[in-house]
């Protein structure tokens, strides 16, 4: 058996008698400590009886700080007593010393046990007095008026403990008070009880007749009793003690001598025995195997890894209890290596091995489970945990390990799988939950991939693919492990658990129920503010009004200007994290924050704008921002901040009284605009509005030249490196800025790759364009802007002049507006301060500008804003969009109409429908619209045909916008066949196509020609070594270590490339692989956080460079150099800058962009 600690001798623990081993195992489980090999050897030396007395003393102790030390202490005292007994020293003199235990109070045993003779009295109904020798106890065995005294030797244990000390059961006949006899066969697995007269002794004793009122003093160490409650008692091989035996034991213990509570005689079993249980009382634990119970000592991350490596194998068939316990004290890296060698390699691919084992404890750990149908069964494969830098609100409240991201896989087959097949198999999974060890996870929430992911999904022709952007989340609701308590969801149904986040039961429809509840899945940063001290107040929405001052209505609902916008006081804004982009903090302080507010059961979504007029600690929200209202009957429940939940969970404090969790979660903030690109929709709308094609061809030529020059020109190289910075941690930009020449092999390889990506984007109409910006939206706090005016705040403050404004993915001819950017006096001084980058819309006029553009609002959407003079010169706007097609009103199911079990089934069924029968209306409408637009821009159409096409396009626009909102409204959207095109332009890459000469067709052809020309003349990038890194020497031990690690990486990466996993999962695993080796190099997440000596880090980084590049030079393939830069890149850049440039300056990469 593998043991990571101790000497060679300690790695072979002493063998204990089965009963002693079983009792020790029980104590280890109860105390959550391992005794260790040395303590076991001490017990083995004592013999069975002495070891039993020691373990009883441990069990009687109120607190045990260190189990191994306590056992060794008691074992030495027991051995001393035994030696004194052998010399004839009275045991009464030694007993108090033995039982006193260590001097520390928490490890003291307060129960004194006396070896001298003490008479215990039990008044029987016949008024007879029963007497026995020292420390005897009496238990009724046959008749209510007759007792049998049981002699408990010296400091011997209670029946609860002593009942386990019978390794083998000898044949024994005992005379009962009524004259009956009973026998028990030797070595039987279970002992039948219930007969009035049964007692068992060790094989070492002879069979004997026993008087009904006394037991010979020789019957001292081995004893079992019968229970009038349970029909069967397991043999000593069983780990846990039957509850009825525990009850008898507890009562007998009170007779053993003076203790914490005074002794009392026993005349009968209590009517309702109370079981003192140290474990969670549920079905999972009751049916648990010893292996499942032993897992608790490992901690959840190790437990998860065990089940991930077992795949679908049963733990009982693979692992022993001793082996599981031997893993407890291993580091994560040692643990992973051990279980991989022992069993993991048999059941999972090497590419599925856990990576990044020593990650920062503060990083998010995402646990995955893939559920798939194989034949007639459903299998569950656990994967991860994967490391991320942001958390959802759900993960923060319940904890990372209590959330499972579950992927329900489609069947791989040539024929389409019927939806009923998925329902038949997967509904059962939702009903039973997903069991992981002694934990049960149940369906909680799901979320589709959003607009972009929907469009991507619909581009894939294979409708029966295995993966999906629809994400399903299960949460842990039950556990049989003590380590899992206290837990905030304990004792709650799934419905009650959801109410912690928001009073979702008040959702008006079933469709809105899950769409609103999915707000807890946004990746957010928690605003560290005490919401109990914050004044959250509602203010009215600003209505749209006509020229006569009347409120404008649509479908009997008033139109509003301020849909999704709120305000926040300056002091709270200053406490907000600095600007956020993709979970990373940027500077300076933001002007706008997109957020989710969970407050006293309500759920609020939108943006807040800094407003200096507000008193401190104030947040103003509007009715349009409130997605779920506080339930009137639950408005007075106890609410706590989410930060308090985290603190209480870490401190293992009870969370059972919490009824609602308050939290202000920041999704994103207004940031400096990044490089702006066009899109196919935007180009066609601009051309339709009069912008000449030649202008876009000029932009195209400039973009192609920039991509071509990226490998040779520093300016173009830095521009393209920053454009793709998120792809590789800005490593190419770091290399360039540190002075590494563009000719460096790996840098050339990366620049060439980014240029290829640039050309692919160009083919799709993604062309860089100057003087255009993407800005977050809100409304004018001053109320001074007119209906056609906006306020645009850029780098240098407010901009004045005409601008084009568009909201992606708008398709209507009038979705691009020409507006006047207007200066608002004293805006910075009296209202928003001097933060930047936003567009403010007016709150005047008969209709909101956001509603006119793609049916939008102001809850954090990003708008395209252009002050490009060429576009402004030629573009002529069209009339704004007005909805013509109204959605068909369908009867919506309400959550309030269902009981909880029916509601859960309906919600999961909706998930299955979203997952396996998705609507393709969105993609169909967009593709048909683009094909019609292509005809408008190329063909010489007469007015009648042009008008007919435009009418079809307007209908498609309405259906497209309806399909965007379908998940929230619950409306079904179908595209009529007469609106679908039969042929598509060639640049769309569809099967039935024609060659288009439109601007999009020309852009595609030009980029395609360049790509073809390059592929014919491509030259492989050779591998050359920079002397700066080759001259640095490192100790041979370091070189040997990293040589080994690199070979290990090559093996793992090869497996990853061969693994049958989707691209997202493969990228995630590669990232974890690199993080693992970075941590080995830096002892931290990054070079900037390392506590190691910089010289040592530089030496090892150069060794990594040398090993990797020398191997890559053999194949002359620069793509094989990536490991050096992905692992040691930051250290190498720093070293190069110091070595070659001398003086350096600290610079902000976002600022350089």
UniProtKB/Swiss-Prot annotation:
UniProt superkingdom = Eukaryota
Q: This chain belongs to which protein, by name?
A: Probable RNA-dependent RNA polymerase 3
Q: Does the keyword Transferase apply?
A: yes
Q: Which organism is it from?
A: Oryza sativa subsp. japonica (Rice)
Q: Give the UniProt keywords, A-Z.
A: Nucleotidyltransferase, RNA-binding, RNA-directed RNA polymerase, RNA-mediated gene silencing, Transferase
The kind of enzyme this is, by top-level EC class, is transferase
Q: Among the record's GO biological process terms, what is one? A: siRNA processing
Q: Which InterPro entries match?
A: RNA-dep_RNA_pol_euk-typ
Q: Under which EC number(s) is this enzyme classified?
A: 2.7.7.48
